[in-house]
């Protein structure tokens, strides 16, 4: 029995040495094993713009106001008619498309891409303040977790100023890639931006 135990003790250090050597050999470099080939290191601005444009009809066709006024009602999801709206309906406005547009505005490849994104951002903010009134605007999308709420009148003033600057930014030589609405036509985006300015001005005149 003693001979067997001595042999086991002699083999144990060799086994441990082999284990640690093997771990050290393979722990520092796993190659591409844990690398996700579907993740990009930098944003694809054309994809961000396309994604934003696809989401725009959801803002344009909001039914919340009609439900509040009882122009029509729901059967399956009656939260809005019962004035019991999930918080995500508000917060989701800031966590999705607006972030994509802000990314293009901050890091986009040219002024035309940035100008279009500013117009779309202004449009979305107009629908947000029309739905909720006073909301975060001037401090939104800046990484501030507790942005101040701006008065709706100040938001409208800011949107008109932003749209003027956005339309003036358009007109360079940079391509508007990912544009599934106007196919990169700068003149049409300028018309849309100016039309949106007129719409907001009409709304202000009624207050």
Where on the chain are the PLM-derived regions?
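Sec-dependent bacterial lipoprotein signal peptides
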Residues: 1-22
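A glycine-rich, coil/turn loop motif that links secondary-structure elements
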Residues: 115, 179-191
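Aromatic-residue-lined binding/catalytic grooves and analogous aromatic/hydrophobic interfacial grooves
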Residues: 23-28, 157-173, 186-207
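Conserved, well-structured interaction surfaces
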Residues: 72-178
